[in-house]
């Protein structure tokens, strides 16, 4: 163990540009210590001012133009520390809901009250329970299910939340969960669904659109979206080679591709709204468009009620 005096003498424990500021965060490129004022969030970790300048020097004209167009406005992010508080909070709440769901006797009742089942939106089947449209994102079928979803949420959220700001990120997540549930009601009205996959795909969709808008390389994101969306179909196809029934095989995979699709589409729309209304004076327009999108999503729920029930 090092003594306090040894700690103070070690310059690696302080920002290289501000020697009086203690920090333990390193630039991902040059590995120099940087304080909160000197760090710029990157796809992985943070970048110091010098490395950021070098990166901008190698940007293409299109990327520079997109960056100027984005940064001309007031910063979207309101998280000065860069800590993804909303992301961590969502993970904590979801984890707590999963733990409660494991409690004998009580857990099953609570999980059943939170899961989404489209008939609960139809008056003739009993009291309407609209909260299920959102709370299904809190319920997971097993440790692997919640583990993969929360891992994806962490990797995307820690990069996307500082860019959008906490409240925009939360709105995106909730609308993604809503979009996934609406898609299930439209495309699989007799299916019970649980999980945050719809909301996760919404984050992917928003990241894809916003990344394209600022001139970032979105190929990796696009590939990840394609792989995650396609894999239940691939598994079902392989399984159907022996059974001959692709539809039944797809249903037995246990993955709601409908929720994935709904979340992805809604996330892309929200990302487009954020990218197009980033100016401070456009905030009323942004809020209005988000409200309009929410109304449209709830309005779409009339279709399964009329068609299926």
Q: Residue spans of the language-model regions?
A:
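A detector for small-residue-rich transmembrane helices and their helix-helix packing motifs
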Residues: 2-6, 32-33, 37, 41-309
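The −1 position to Zn-ligating cysteines in a subset of zinc-ribbon hairpins
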Residues: 11-14, 26, 34, 47
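Long, low-complexity, intrinsically disordered cytosolic termini of multi-pass membrane proteins
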Residues: 1, 8-11, 20-22, 34
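Canonical RING-type zinc finger of E3 ubiquitin-protein ligases
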Residues: 19-30, 37-41
């Amino acid at each position: 163990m090092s003594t306090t005096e040894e700690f103070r003498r070690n310059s690696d424990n302080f920002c290289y540009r501000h020697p009086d500021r203690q920090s333990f965060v390193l630039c991902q490129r040059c590995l120099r210590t940087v304080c909160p004022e000197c760090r710029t969030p990157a796809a992985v970790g943070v970048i110091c001012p010098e490395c950021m300048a070098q990166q901008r020097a190698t940007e293409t004209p299109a990327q520079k133009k997109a960056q100027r167009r984005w940064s001309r406005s007031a910063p979207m992010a309101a998280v000065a520390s860069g800590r993804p508080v909303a992301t961590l909070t969502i993970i904590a709440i979801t984890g707590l809901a999963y733990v409660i769901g494991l409690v004998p006797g009580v857990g099953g009742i609570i999980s059943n009250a939170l899961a989404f089942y489209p008939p609960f939106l139809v008056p003739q089947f009993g009291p309407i329970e609209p909260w299920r449209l959102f709370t299904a994102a809190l319920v997971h079928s097993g440790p692997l299910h919640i583990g993969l979803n929360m891992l994806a949420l962490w990797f995307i959220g820690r990069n996307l939340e500082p860019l959008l700001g906490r409240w925009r990120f939360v709105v995106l997540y909730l609308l993604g969960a809503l979009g996934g549930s609406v898609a299930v009601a439209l495309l699989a009205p007799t299916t019970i669904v649980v999980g945050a996959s719809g909301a996760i795909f919404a984050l992917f969709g928003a990241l894809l659109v916003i990344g394209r808008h600022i001139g970032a390389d979105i190929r990796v994101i696009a590939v990840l979206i394609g792989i995650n969306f396609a894999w239940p179909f691939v598994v079902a196809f392989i399984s159907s080679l022996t059974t001959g029934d692709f539809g039944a095989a797809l249903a037995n995979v246990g993955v709601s591709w409908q929720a994935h699709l709904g979340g992805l589409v809604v996330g892309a729309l929200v990302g487009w709204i954020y990218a197009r209304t980033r100016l401070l004076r456009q905030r009323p327009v942004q809020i209005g468009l988000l409200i309009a999108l929410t109304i449209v999503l709830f309005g779409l729920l009339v279709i399964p009620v009329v068609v299926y029930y």
